[in-house]
């Protein structure tokens, strides 16, 4: 159980998962979202996991930012309903999918994006690093290198998708795209500043900082029967 320092917390179920195929995680998110649309009283959720190598595009993404032929089928590519341009997921990148009812917090998408950034910035502070925001962009940077990408979808004020923090990934996959459509700002990973860092150790701090920023009490849980990976 992880509590924020604030009283009167909302409960939030924490699903700490390992390596999960992207489409399984996406289907799981949709299931959790739909349940909460039909029953808004259900507890919020934070999923933490990693993905096998996969490229995802937001619903309005420009395929010009992809440097390979999607039709060749050489790489796993999926277009989904989040905002933002193309991004890359792989082992060593910690992905967070909050399923939150923003009516419990603030019905403001800009506020929500800044809160997700704040979670990452606080995690970096734990390691003595100063995360930065860049005006007009969403995400978190370290010394000019983007270490966290954020893309969300909200339906009836309930969120899905979320953030991806580059902890210790193989960065070669990013060379095949223009990450997030930003050509003049390189991507980076925490391992460049903290050799030997792992997703396993970062998970705790991400959960802790998430609880603090959103004022929730995290209850570590396991997926129920409705989630059966295909």
From Swiss-Prot:
Site (Lowers pKa of active site Cys): 146
GO biological process: protein modification process
CDD domains cross-referenced by the UniProt entry: LipB (cd16444)
UniProt-annotated location(s): Cytoplasm
Active-site residues annotated for this sequence: 180
Membrane-spanning segments: none
Domain BPL/LPL catalytic: 40-218
Enzyme Commission designation: 2.3.1.181
Purpose of the protein: Catalyzes the transfer of endogenously produced octanoic acid from octanoyl-acyl-carrier-protein onto the lipoyl domains of lipoate-dependent enzymes. Lipoyl-ACP can also act as a substrate although octanoyl-ACP is likely to be the physiological substrate.
Positions of substrate binding: 82-89, 149-151, 162-164
Catalysed reactions, semicolon-separated: octanoyl-[ACP] + L-lysyl-[protein] = N(6)-octanoyl-L-lysyl-[protein] + holo-[ACP] + H(+)
Any single Pfam family the record assigns to this protein: LplA-B_cat
Protein name per its UniProtKB record: Octanoyltransferase
Pathway: Protein modification; protein lipoylation via endogenous pathway; protein N(6)-(lipoyl)lysine from octanoyl-[acyl-carrier-protein]: step 1/2
Further remark: In the reaction, the free carboxyl group of octanoic acid is attached via an amide linkage to the epsilon-amino group of a specific lysine residue of lipoyl domains of lipoate-dependent enzymes.
Catalytic EC class: transferase
Sequence similarity: Belongs to the LipB family.
Gene3D superfamilies linked to this entry: Bira Bifunctional Protein, Domain 2
Entry keywords, A to Z: Acyltransferase, Cytoplasm, Transferase
The species this protein was found in: Nostoc punctiforme (strain ATCC 29133 / PCC 73102)
The organism's place on the tree of life at top rank: Bacteria
Main localisation: cytoplasm
One Gene Ontology cellular component: cytoplasm
Gene: lipB
């Amino acid at each position: 159980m992880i509590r924020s320092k604030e009283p009167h917390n909302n409960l939030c179920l924490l699903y700490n998962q390992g390596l999960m195929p992207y489409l399984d995680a996406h289907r799981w998110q949709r299931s959790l979202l739909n349940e909460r649309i039909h029953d808004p009283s259900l507890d919020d959720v934070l999923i933490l996991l990693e993905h096998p190598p996969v490229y995802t595009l937001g619903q309005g993404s420009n395929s010009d930012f992809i440097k390979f032929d999607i039709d060749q089928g050489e790489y796993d590519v999926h277009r989904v309903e989040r905002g933002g341009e193309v991004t890359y997921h792989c082992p060593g990148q910690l992905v967070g999918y909050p399923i939150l009812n923003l009516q419990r917090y603030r019905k403001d998408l800009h506020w929500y994006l800044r809160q997700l950034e704040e979670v990452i910035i606080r995690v970096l502070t734990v390691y003595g690093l100063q995360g930065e925001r860049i005006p007009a962009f969403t995400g978190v940077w370290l010394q000019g290198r983007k270490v966290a990408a954020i893309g969300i979808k909200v339906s009836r004020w309930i969120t899905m998708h979320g953030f991806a923090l580059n902890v210790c990934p193989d960065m070669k996959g990013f060379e095949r795209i223009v990450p997030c459509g930003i050509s003049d700002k390189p991507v980076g990973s925490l391992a460049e500043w903290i050799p030997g860092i792992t997703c396993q150790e970062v998970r705790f701090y991400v959960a802790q900082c998430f609880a603090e920023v959103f004022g929730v009490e995290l209850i570590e849980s396991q997926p129920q029967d409705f989630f059966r990976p295909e």
